[in-house]
C-alpha cells in the first residue's frame, strides 16, 4: 500500500508528522486540501489523496493491449517483431508486470560505465541516497514503459532525448553490446510506441518524444 511505501525507512525516512508538516508549509496547498479533507493534512488524508490521484494514472487499451487480447491488426508487423525482440533480449526481466516496470531497482552500469565522460552528481548515487548502503550505489527504480513515447526525456539524468537514444544506452550498459543493430533499434521503437494507452476512453495526450 501507499502507507507501507512511505513507512519504508530505506526509501522514505520521514514519518507522517514530518511529512504533514512539510506539506502544511505550502499554505495554498493546505487550503485546497481542507476543501476536500476538513481535518487537514494527516497520514490518512495524504494516502487517500495519493490513491485517488493514482486512479487517474490507469491508461488501458493501448494498441499492444488490444493485440494481446487477440486483435492481430492492432499493431504493425514491425511492432510485432519488436515485441519478439524485446522478449529475446530479456527486457521483460526488469520491465515486467502490467505496468511493464516500476517494480524493482536495478544497476545503471551493469555492463559498462554509464557515468563516463561527465562529472557525477549526488543523484547518480540512486537508491544509496535513501538506503545509505554502498551496495545500492547506482541502483535506480526501473520505470514503467506505459506511455513511454510521451514521457521523455529518459534515464534518471534525462540524458536520452529519444527512444533510440534510450535503447542505445540499454544496449551498452545493460546488455553489454558494443555494436548496435540499427534495424533492431527501429523494431524496438515500433513496439514501444504501441504502449500508449487511453484515459477516459480517449488516447493519452502529450508531447511525443523527438525522432532520432
What are these regions (language model features)?
Residues 1-212:
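Periplasmic c-type cytochrome electron-transfer domains
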